[in-house]
């Protein structure tokens, strides 16, 4: 069990670029460690052109024995330009390509990563964006499997889950008004039946999970509108909006006085002891850090999140 009451704030600060975003936390049973994967933005890049500092990013990896004390481990290694995106042949005005927003699932003794690939290093928000599937045994070195054929070539922020033998991927389709979109697969590689999940404005970072005997969808409502939560009976369709969390800027913890972005969820415990932990990032200018809070069920049946509930106890790992 992750003891959130002992979590530092910030939880993690990338020691190389101070631009950790898009956290995804998963337990590796073979390594007996928690792995945190994140986009390693180049937040301290000197004199960047436009938003080039958000491009050219690698996938950072931190590990933890307890889910609260994190140590920077490495950046993800692998073929298909995963190791060194800046050395790749890109289509943008600056050298290289970009990796963003990894999502993970553990299946058949392998970690499966679905990560956004941008085909260049751009100074604006252009370029082709696809979801790429990699696998890994150790969680550090990955092998390319396939590039998903989805609803457009402007898709980002994939997460994958399984219901009754079918895999579902939710993602942001920027070519469809940045709506949350869902595709399905029987083999984790051939994706079909793309359809819109929610019509509620621009969204990114969709993630589906089980909590309180129900299916939940959490999204980052852009721009700076907090984390919207939806509920479904079957986890596939019929999503109903319930509430929004981490919308305010009244966090009292260090570097937590801003809207929460791009959630990663860990649900632990059972029954009355079940907890929904949310890993998210906050901005301080270009620089970002990862924070940890708890989503709880309010008395009215709507999720709430008091980020100030637990006081920080130690300095963040990675500093």
Q: Model-predicted segments: where are they?
A:
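Carbohydrate-active catalytic/glycan-binding domains of CAZyme proteins
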Residues: 1-319
């Amino acid at each position: 069990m992750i003891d959130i009451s002992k979590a530092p704030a910030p939880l993690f600060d990338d020691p190389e670029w101070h631009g950790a975003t898009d956290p995804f936390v998963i337990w590796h049973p073979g390594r007996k460690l928690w792995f945190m994967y994140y986009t390693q933005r180049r937040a301290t890049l000197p004199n960047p052109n436009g938003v080039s500092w958000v491009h050219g990013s690698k996938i950072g990896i931190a590990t933890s024995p307890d889910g609260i004390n994190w140590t920077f481990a490495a950046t993800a290694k692998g073929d298909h330009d995963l190791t060194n995106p800046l050395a790749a042949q890109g289509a943008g005005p600056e050298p290289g390509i970009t990796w963003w927003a990894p999502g993970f699932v553990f299946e058949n003794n392998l970690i499966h990563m679905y990560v956004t690939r941008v085909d260049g290093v751009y100074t604006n928000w252009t370029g082709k964006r696809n979801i790429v599937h990699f696998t890994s045994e150790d969680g550090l070195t990955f092998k390319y499997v396939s590039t998903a054929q989805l609803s457009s070539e402007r898709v980002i922020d994939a997460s994958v889950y399984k219901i009754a033998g079918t895999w579902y991927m939710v993602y942001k389709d920027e070519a469809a008004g940045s709506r949350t979109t869902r595709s399905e697969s029987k083999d984790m590689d051939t994706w079909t039946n793309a359809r819109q999940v929610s019509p509620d404005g621009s969204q990114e970072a969709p993630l589906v999970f089980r909590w309180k005997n129900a299916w939940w969808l959490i999204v980052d409502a852009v721009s700076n509108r907090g984390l919207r939560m939806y509920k479904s009976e079957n986890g596939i369709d019929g999503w109903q909006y319930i509430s929004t969390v981490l919308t305010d800027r009244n966090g009292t913890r260090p570097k937590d006085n801003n809207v929460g972005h791009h959630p990663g969820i860990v649900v632990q415990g059972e029954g009355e002891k079940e907890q929904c932990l949310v890993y998210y990032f906050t901005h301080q200018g270009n620089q970002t850090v990862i924070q940890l809070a708890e989503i709880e069920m309010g008395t009215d049946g709507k999720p709430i999140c008091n980020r100030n509930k637990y006081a920080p106890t130690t300095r963040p790992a990675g500093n």
